[in-house]
């Protein structure tokens, strides 16, 4: 998903 998790698996 495109949210606060997009930095976890760049």
From Swiss-Prot:
Protein's UniProt keywords contain Secreted: yes
Keywords: Amidation, Hormone, Neuropeptide, Secreted
Phenylalanine amide PTM positions: 10
Localization terms from the record: Secreted
Broad class of the protein's primary localization: secreted
Presence of the UniProt keyword Lipoprotein in the record: no
Gene Ontology biological process terms, A to Z: neuropeptide signaling pathway
Superkingdom per UniProt: Eukaryota
GO molecular function: hormone activity
GO cellular component labels: extracellular region
General function of this protein: Neuropeptide. Stimulates egg development in L.migratoria, but not in N.bullata. May be involved in the regulation of adult diapause.
Family indicated by similarity: Belongs to the NPY family.
The protein's name in its UniProt record: Neuropeptide NPF-1
The species this protein was found in: Leptinotarsa decemlineata
């Amino acid at each position: 998903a495109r949210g606060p998790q997009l930095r976890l698996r760049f």
